[in-house]
Amino acid sequence: LQFGIHSLLFAETFLDKNLPLLDKCKAMGFDAVEIIPFDPDGFPAAKVRAAAADLGLTINTGYGMPEQYNVISPDPAIRQAGIDFSKKLIDLSNEAGAKVFGGMIYCGWGYLTGKMRTADEWRWGVDSYREIAAYAQQNSDLILGIEPVNRFESHFINTAADALRFIREVGLPNVKVHLDTFHMIREEDDFAGAVLEVGNQLGYVHACENQRGIPGSGLVPWQSFFQSLDSIGYDGCITIESFDPNMESIAKLCCIWRKLADSPEQLATEGLKFLRQAYSSVHAHQ
């Protein structure tokens, strides 16, 4: 099992000037870093790959699709733009040596119609993602992680069961479920049950408190969560995802209106210590 940290805790995007962040994350004790290339044309993918290899770090990538790249849009031109942009992000992820590309990569982030998901939207999403996943499969072993998110960010995939149905209908082995405890605590009826239901289709995990603070400081039932991860034999990456309210563009997108720790470094290091201890205590008793 690997423990990772999210680049958005420290930087609003990832450019050449942000490469020292990889050394910093390694020094804090992390095994992996998740990078969001919000400026894809400025993302130094090859340099990330080389630096990570030197440091012994695993790289994962993620994204929240803007509305102009929304593959469940009723506009076929927007859906096609989303497919094309997804392929570009997959190419960048491969160039950076990423193991997983996950997140809200299957519809527009914050796209809400004011109605329940429709059969047309589901079909558009599955058809688009089948093409995207087939493209990814041709070029690498990259895992695509479908992350269920809370109802305030999307009406499309809110639960582990939704994500499972989606990946089964896409039907390609490189598409997995990406669970995030921040969203789970808002949407799931049974924390451990959701993990057990996903089982071997779990490809990636975000470890976030219910309030986006230091893991262990809130309401997430970490013991039962880690017990269920252990039960299914999950051996992938668990990444702490949180954000700094001083980064205005990210804070606005993620609705972070207060300090969640004394510093991003405190959130990262104390969160890592808590998660390692929580996992070890469960794993030792299995």
Please report, for each region that a protein language model flagged, where it lies by residue.
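The substrate-binding groove and active-site-proximal loops of carbohydrate-active enzymes
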Residues: 70-80, 119, 211-216
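N-terminal substrate-binding region of glycoside hydrolase catalytic domains
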Residues: 22-42, 68
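Active-site acidic/histidine proton-transfer and metal-coordination neighborhood
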Residues: 53-54, 76-176, 258, 262-266, ...
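A short acidic, helix-capping loop that chelates divalent metal ions and anchors anionic groups
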Residues: 68-73, 109-115, 152-153, 186, ...
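Active-site-proximal loop/turn and secondary-structure-junction residues that shape catalytic pockets
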Residues: 9-11, 37-39, 65-67, 105-110, ...
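Active-site-adjacent beta->alpha loops and helix N-cap segments on the catalytic face
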Residues: 41-51
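Hydrophobic residues within beta-strands of alpha/beta enzymes
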Residues: 33, 60, 101, 144, ...
